[in-house]
Amino acid sequence: MLTTGVKSLDELLGGGIGEGVLTQVYGSFATGKTTLAVQIGLLSGGRVAYIDTEGGFSPERLGQIAEARGLDPEDALSRFILFTPADFKEQRRVIGNLKKVVDRGFSLVVVDSITAHYRVEEHRRNLTAELGKQLQVLLWIARKNDIPVIVINQVHFDSRVERMKPVAEHTLGYRTKDILRLDRLSSPGLRVAILERHRFRPEGGMVYFRITEKGIEEAINGAKKITP
């Protein structure tokens, strides 16, 4: 397993981010999704295939987190292999090519986010099957190389239930075994991570964390809550 760098979050996840499976991390804007994924990759010590569909990956931020944690920023940057598909068609090509690129020398694959290009397509219903195929390729990569794959997801407001829900909920939910939701709280910089589904941990557990120059850190006086 890969550590998140936050002890309470690792405990919530049963030790960290699982290998050989897809982990879905979703939430609204500025909840810490990208920071968490970057931090996990940084602390993994290996190469990271990072697919950035939203332009949210920042080399400067990665360098800042590395330096704040006493790591070499240049070494950190050299370990991240960045892909920037411009549309859903190119995203399909990039993910397909990962089968030739990723091997056991990689410690992590991240898609940030898996649904950004999917959402802007006019005929989204026709692309649901294609999204499922991309997830299946990512799952194959995870299993073949025994590494974690993190798929970051966006949210949308579902007027039928009057709450925010993950985009393509059923398509992603079918293939992602562990699902973590991140939410903002009223206190500046304070966030909460809620475990919505896991292979062997109780659902509904939560931990509080802060976003700092070091990335994701334990919240001061933060606590973990496990709900059976």
Predicted regions and their residues:
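Structural motif
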Residues: 23, 48-49, 107-108, 148-150, ...
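Anionic group-transfer/hydrolysis microenvironments
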Residues: 26, 54, 114, 155, ...
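Phosphate-binding/switch region of NTP-binding enzymes
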Residues: 140-228
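P-loop NTPase motor core
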Residues: 85-174
